[in-house]
Amino acid sequence: MSDNGQNSASPHIPVMLADVLDVLKPRDGGVYVDGTFGAGGYTRAILGSADCAVLAIDRDPTAILRGRALATEFAGRLTLIEGRFGDMKRLVRELGHGTVDGVVLDIGVSSMQLDQAERGFSFQQDGPLDMRMGGEGPSAADVVNHFDEADLARIIAVYGEEKRARAVARAIVAARQTAELHRTLELADLVASVIHRKPQDRIHPATRTFQALRIFVNDELGELARGLSGAEDLLHEGGRLAVVAFHSLEDRIVKRFLTARTGRAGRANRYMPERDEVAPSFREIAHKAMKASEEEVEINVRARSAKLRAAERTAAPALPLDLAALGFRAVPTLDGSLA
């Protein structure tokens, strides 16, 4: 995810690339999954460091189209897959791969998507209020124009961690009585009229609302949970997982997932009964999240908020996915609220 100010870098620079390669340790003959292909930065580096193969997944058809040149450059070693990384287990197995050697995920919206006003992700450029990464399903405009006030407030509070979510939702509902909201700057200006920017504020008043709508429209947190579970199923013993997250919402999910699967979860408190002993499906590569160096942050501002968590697969069976244990909270559903 780009930094909260939406100061995207162009061309796209893969964050913590050297650290990711050090985690994955690509080897000749290996098969690796880049679940968030984007501009192909991680994929290119993996293919360039060993005579291996990469299965690159992206739900954005424009990313797949741009990736064709890279597939030509690394003929026979790069397979481009249009789809969601949350479905990686099915997508990879359909290609005949039972297991893989490594998985890398770079979570959130890409700087390229922010730079394209017509995609509707940016509150700094005027464009259609869309925000769909893959172009399918209801758009952000559908959400702001059809969800009731309580549902909008819940989405903005949970996914944007916006303290004034109720006031923002109230303003949206009032504004659409006169005219529906269909442009990004319309919504950004409306939110700014509710959340007045203070001189010391580092982020735009609409940052959290736009983040919440984007996460909701694309089911980003559900996608992340399913992707982590899919990686757990696909990685063979010794296979490695590297996840780069830019926001606390995503990083908390990754942390909880790996904490549970490395055997560090323990009891929630001393009054809870002991859990049955379960063999850890991952072992830690680093106890804490890794952060970008000061030198990298100077070159690439996106790296400022990046956290890399990594683990190595054990021989133990994969554990069932438990969304509640990952901290998921109840929110409206796209289908239910738009029906």
Swiss-Prot record:
Disulfide bonds: none
Binding site for S-adenosyl-L-methionine: 40-42, 58, 85, 106, 113
InterPro entries per record: RsmH, SAM-dep_MeTrfase_MraW_recog, SAM-dependent_MTases_sf
Catalyses which reaction(s): cytidine(1402) in 16S rRNA + S-adenosyl-L-methionine = N(4)-methylcytidine(1402) in 16S rRNA + S-adenosyl-L-homocysteine + H(+)
Broad class of the protein's primary localization: cytoplasm
Keywords: Cytoplasm, Methyltransferase, rRNA processing, S-adenosyl-L-methionine, Transferase
Transport recorded as keyword: no
Pfam families: Methyltransf_5 (PF01795)
Biological process terms in GO annotation: rRNA base methylation
Compartments reported by the entry: Cytoplasm
Name of the top EC class for this enzyme: transferase
Enzyme Commission number, as recorded: 2.1.1.199
One GO CC term, this protein: cytoplasm
Molecular function per GO: rRNA (cytosine-N4-)-methyltransferase activity
Source organism, top-level taxon: Bacteria
Task of the protein: Specifically methylates the N4 position of cytidine in position 1402 (C1402) of 16S rRNA.
Family recorded in the similarity comment: Belongs to the methyltransferase superfamily. RsmH family.
Protein name per Swiss-Prot or TrEMBL: Ribosomal RNA small subunit methyltransferase H
Species per Swiss-Prot/TrEMBL record: Parvibaculum lavamentivorans (strain DS-1 / DSM 13023 / NCIMB 13966)
High-level lineage: Bacteria, Pseudomonadati, Pseudomonadota, Alphaproteobacteria, Hyphomicrobiales
